[in-house]
Amino acid sequence: MAAKGAREKIRLVSSAETGHFYTTDKNKRNMPEKMEIKKFDPVVRKHVIYKEAKIK
């Protein structure tokens, strides 16, 4: 039986407090720290920082 993969599903939540989020996955071995990335928030129609959160 194969081992579990290192990739984990995460949720990127908008820092503009609009409730908008993106879902993606990341490799925990290569990037153990929390992910922060600048993406477009369609609610405020601007690029804002999205921070990693766990998928519930």
Curated annotation (Swiss-Prot):
Pfam families: Ribosomal_L33 (PF00471). GO terms for biological process: translation. InterPro entries: Ribosomal_bL33, Ribosomal_bL33_CS, Ribosomal_bL33_sf, Ribosomal_zn-bd. Keywords: Ribonucleoprotein, Ribosomal protein. GO terms for molecular function: structural constituent of ribosome. One of its GO terms (cellular component) is cytosolic large ribosomal subunit. NCBIfam families: PRK00595.1 (NF001860), rpmG_bact (TIGR01023). Belongs to the bacterial ribosomal protein bL33 family. HAMAP family: Ribosomal_bL33. This is Large ribosomal subunit protein bL33. It comes from Mannheimia succiniciproducens (strain KCTC 0769BP / MBEL55E). The lineage of its organism: Bacteria, Pseudomonadati, Pseudomonadota, Gammaproteobacteria, Pasteurellales.
